Amino acid sequence: MVLANVYDSQCQERLEIVPYQGEEIPFAVQRPIWPDFYPFIIIFSLTLHFNNVSIINNMGFFSIFSREKKETLNQGLEKTKQSFFGKLSRALVGKSSVDDEVLDNLEEILVTSDVGVDTTLEIIQRIEQRVARDKYVTTTELNHVLRDEIVGLLTESGAQDEQEFAIPSGKKPYVVMVVGVNGVGKTTTIGKLAYQFKKAGLKVYLGAADTFRAAAVEQLCIWGERVGVPVIKQNMGSDPASVAFDTLASALANDADVVLIDTAGRLHNKKGLMDELSKIKRVMQKQIPDAPHEVLLVLDGSTGQNAFEQARQFTAATEVTGMAITKLDGSAKGGVVIGVSHQFKIPVRYIGLGEGMEDLQPFDRKEFVDSLFSEQV
């Protein structure tokens, strides 16, 4: 039996001793807590309680976030909107109806807006069917038709108008494993989620399971101290699965609502990644049999087509159930939200629209499309 010392986010107050029992996982005895800016596999656990009354049946997972962020959404998508509709307006000059030339131009615009080839062809095919059915579609109506088809694609991928990702009763803690490569903003995403969860009255734990990089652990600890939540860590080189085990054990022992575990996001090779994620899942299940309840993939929206390749590699390595797409405010590549969600049939859960704590928003398909097409339809 190995004993793990667990400390608060200041790495001072000892909270408990957690016995580890199960398959052999080498790790150090002393494990203070720290944080990281390049999170890779995060694990959250969540149950909503207010005044000691569970409200999970009346309140979705994403409902705890403020919905008064329309202005932030509009500003964050401004570059994408200007680029896309600027190209579209130029392509429609002198045209009164949608014909083959208009559709060819639209196809090129969608591809260059990082919607992706497969998704673009699907959109064009649907518009062609609409034109054939209605016999005549004006260029003015094209924006409305295009908007409807994008909403339809996001709907088919599981995106919601109201984020109704309800937490089942008895799932405390609710466990989410978040995966992604280095540098996509995973640690920032973890920190902002921790902040918003805590602000909503939830008890949050972080686990620094990226044991391959000292900077990762330190950066996660910065977020833990900034937000005021405990962070569980081990020494460099320890097994990430053992950090996940310790974090869930501490979360259970201390009645936590949310646990975010940050682990390495190295795309070394498909088999290595798959083995690592599988082991983390297997070890977590020694604490919580049905963990993880969600696997969240974090992608950098500003990388455009690279986001598709990252999604391809992670979906091949593990089951991904949701995505967070960050850094949408810094580029005109917002089309990646539509394309990657449609191509991999995975709903977008969050979008990052700035550096502020409140700028990580739960994704709402209707608000997203309304903002993208605002002042255009």
For the regions a protein language model found, what residue spans apply to each?
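Conserved catalytic-core segment of NTP-binding enzymes
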Residues: Q219, M236-N254, H268-V377
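Alpha-helix boundary/capping motif
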Residues: V6-D8, Q21
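N-terminal accessory targeting/assembly segments
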Residues: T47, V53-G86
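Primarily NTPase-proximal linker/entry elements flanking Walker-type ATP/GTP-binding cores
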Residues: N74, E78-A209, A216-M236, A244-L252, ...
